[in-house]
Amino acid sequence: MNKLLKWATEIDSIAQAGLTYSKDVYDIDRFNQLKNIAADIISESTNLELHKVKEVLFEERGYLTPKVDVRAAIIKENKILLVKEKLDGTWSLPGGWADINLSVSENIKKEAYEEAGAKVKPKSIIAILDRNKHNKPLMVQSIYKIFILCDLLDVNFNDNIETE
């Protein structure tokens, strides 16, 4: 992540914390100004449209924390199961956003089944990565990707809205 983008996301995080905890109307106005400045910097640094950056930054409420993405590493007979994303045609491990009220294990079972029709038994977490340190393009949000090694119990792929 380049320094300018790093600083902009830190400014946004500080502004969001201020908006969450401040009661003073003048401070709230200043924190909103900081969020707008952060959005301008992010837009200029990434070539993302300003209104889209603002949509992401201003929809967040509360203290900012990373989003969590879970991915199933399903290996059988030296082959790894990948799914093709309908959105952009790229190949990836089955997975997605972690849902609230589900454990990491429950989330990975759900995602593997939804995206690949795979019934799995999660064995162990093999990696936790900060997405922006390992992927392009950079995302406005901070995302932690949790990779879970899974045993494949059964597979029966069904057409779905996310993968093919």
Language-model region placement:
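Long alpha-helical scaffolds
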Residues: A8, A15, F31, K35-A38, ...
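Secondary-structure edge/capping motif, primarily at the C-terminal ends of alpha-helices
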Residues: A15-S22
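N-terminal strand-loop-strand
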Residues: K54-L93, V120, S124, L152
